[in-house]
Design a protein with these regions (language model features):
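Intrinsically disordered, low-complexity non-transmembrane regions of multi-pass membrane transporters
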Residues: 1-20, 203-219, 253-260, 268, ...
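Juxtamembrane interface elements at the cytosolic ends of transmembrane helices
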Residues: 2, 31-33, 164-171, 182, ...
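Membrane-embedded helical hairpins/re-entrant loop segments and their flanking transmembrane helices
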Residues: 5-16, 38-59, 65, 235-305
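Transmembrane helix-boundary motif of multi-pass solute transporters/channels
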Residues: 21-54, 66-91
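C-terminal ends of transmembrane helices
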Residues: 54-66, 104-118, 168-176, 245-256, ...
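Interfacial segments of multi-pass membrane proteins
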Residues: 79-88, 172, 293-308, 314-318
C-alpha cells in the first residue's frame, strides 16, 4: 500500500488490512463511548453491542455512502440524569425512544422539503466556525481525560500522554506504506506500553481483566414511558439535529463529497435517530456519529465503509467476550486523551477548510461578524437554559449563527445591507 493513498468510501480492503484498520476505529471511539454508561452506572457491554448494531444500520440505511461510526451521545447526559434520579433508568429509555422517533419524523420532513435551506441558514461564513467548534469545544475534554490538567496530573500520566500524542503526530507525518494508515492504533499501543512502564496501568488490572468470564451477555432492558420524563428529554432533539448536520458537513469535507445530497441528510438523520430509538428499546444509551472517528479518517485518509463496518462487528463481538471488553477498558485516560488531543484539532481544522475552500470574503462585514460571533459564542462558556435543557458550545453557537444568517438574508432581500 502506497503512503498517503486515499482509500475511498466504496473501496474494498484486503482482510489482512481490514482488521487493524477496524481496530483503530474501535479504539478511537472507545474512551468516550463507554464514559456515558459509566456516568449512568450501567454495564458498558450493552453500549458496545448497540454501537455496533447502530453503525451497521447507519451504513445500510445510507447505502454505504456515508462513513460514520455511531457511539454514545453526550447530549442526553444532563436531562437523562434528572430522569434517572426521579423515575429510574427505564423511564430514561422511554425518553430516548421518543426522541429517536421524533428525529425520524424530522428526517421525513427534510426528505419532503429538501436541503437548499441549509445554504441560507448556514452559509459558509457560519458553517465553517460551527464545524470548527465541534472539535475546539472538546479540547478541554481531551486535556482533562488525558490527566494533564487539574489534580490528576502525575509524571506518569504526562509521560503516557506525550508518548501517545508524539507517536500519533510524527507517525501521521513519517510512517510509510501500510503503517501510514494506522498511526492512531500504533500510538494507542505505544501509549499503553508507556502506561504500564510508568505505573499508570497496574499489572494486576490487566491480570484481572484476563480472568474475566469469557462469555458475557449484555444486560438488556425494556423502556417505560412517562410524559413528564419524556418532556424533560425531548428538547435534546434540537441539540442532536444540529450536531448531526455539523458532523455530516465535516465528514463530507474530509472525504470530498456532499453527504447532504448523496446519500442525503434525510437518510443519515433517519439512520442516526433510528439507532437511538432501537437503543432505547433494548436498554442502551442514545447513539450519535462520532467526531473521533472523523478525525481518524482525516489523518489516515481511509474512508472505506467496510473498515467502519468491521469496527462495528468488532464492537459487537467485544460486548460478548468478557476478557476482551475488560482489557479495552484498561486503556487509561492519558492514552485516550493523547489521541483525542490530535483528533479534535483535526476536526477544528476541517471547519477552517470550509472557509478557505469556499473563498469566504472577509472584506464583507456580514461574513466577518457571522464568523466572529459564532466563534465567541461557542468558546465563551455562555449557556442558555430552556427548562432542564441547557444550550451551550457548538449547539448554541449554531442556533445564534442560524438566526443571524436568516436576519442577514432578509436584509439582502430588502436591499438594506451595506455590503456590496
Amino acid at each position: 500500500m502506497q503512503s498517503n493513498r486515499i482509500i475511498q468510501v466504496e473501496e474494498k480492503v484486503l482482510p489482512r488490512l481490514l482488521v487493524p484498520l477496524s481496530i483503530q476505529h474501535m479504539f478511537a471511539m472507545f474512551g468516550a463511548s463507554v464514559l456515558v454508561p459509566f456516568i449512568f452506572k450501567m454495564n458498558p457491554a450493552i453500549v458496545l453491542f448497540m454501537n455496533g448494531i447502530g453503525t451497521l444500520l447507519f451504513i445500510l440505511i445510507t447505502k454505504g455512502k456515508a462513513p460514520a461510526y455511531l457511539g454514545s451521545s453526550f447530549a442526553f447526559i444532563a436531562p437523562a440524569t434528572i430522569v434517572i434520579k426521579n423515575w429510574g433508568y427505564q423511564y430514561a429509555l422511554g425518553g430516548f425512544v421518543v426522541v429517536g422517533a421524533c428525529g425520524c419524523v424530522l428526517a421525513f420532513i427534510i426528505y419532503k422539503c429538501g436541503t437548499d435551506w441549509i445554504n441560507v441558514v448556514l452559509p459558509p461564513a457560519a458553517m465553517g466556525p460551527v464545524v470548527a467548534l465541534i472539535g475546539l469545544e472538546l479540547a478541554g475534554s481531551a486535556a482533562s481525560t488525558g490527566c494533564i490538567v487539574g489534580d490528576s496530573v502525575t509524571t506518569g500520566t504526562v509521560i503516557t500522554f506525550l508518548v501517545t500524542l508524539a507517536v500519533a503526530v510524527f507517525g501521521s507525518v513519517l510512517f510509510r506504506g501500510f503503517f501510514s494508515t494506522i498511526p492512531i492504533l500504533i500510538a494507542i499501543i505505544c501509549g499503553y506500553i508507556a502506561g504500564v512502564l510508568t505505573g499508570v496501568i497496574e499489572t494486576q488490572t490487566i491480570i484481572d481483566a484476563l480472568h474475566t468470564s469469557f462469555i458475557s451477555i449484555p444486560n438488556f432492558q425494556t423502556p417505560k414511558f412517562d410524559i413528564n420524563a419524556i418532556l424533560i428529554i425531548l428538547p435534546v432533539l434540537l441539540v442532536i439535529a444540529n450536531e448531526h448536520i455539523g458532523h455530516q458537513l465535516v465528514t463530507g469535507k474530509v472525504i470530498g463529497r456532499d453527504l447532504l445530497k448523496d446519500p442525503g441528510l434525510h437518510r443519515s438523520l433517519f439512520a442516526d435517530n433510528f439507532s437511538t430509538m432501537i437503543s432505547g428499546f433494548i436498554g442502551s444509551v442514545p447513539t450519535t456519529t462520532y467526531g473521533e472517528n472523523i478525525g481518524v479518517m482525516a489523518i489516515t485518509k481511509v474512508y472505506s465503509v467496510r473498515v467502519i463496518g468491521g469496527a462495528a462487528v468488532l464492537s459487537i463481538i467485544c460486548s460478548f467476550v468478557g476478557p476482551l471488553a475488560a482489557l479495552i477498558q484498561t486503556i487509561p485516560g492519558p492514552v485516550i486523551g493523547g489521541i483525542s488531543f490530535l483528533l479534535y484539532g483535526m476536526i477544528g481544522t476541517s471547519g477552517l477548510r470550509i472557509l478557505v475552500d469556499n473563498h469566504v470574503d472577509y472584506s464583507k462585514n456580514r461574513n466577518m461578524i457571522l464568523t466572529s460571533v459564532i466563534f465567541v459564542t461557542g468558546l465563551s462558556g455562555v449557556t442558555l437554559a430552556l427548562g432542564d435543557v441547557s444550550l451551550s458550545g457548538m449547539t448554541l453557537a449554531a442556533i445564534v449563527g442560524m438566526i443571524m444568517s436568516l436576519v442577514f438574508y432578509a436584509f439582502d432581500k430588502f436591499h438594506l445591507s451595506n455590503d456590496v
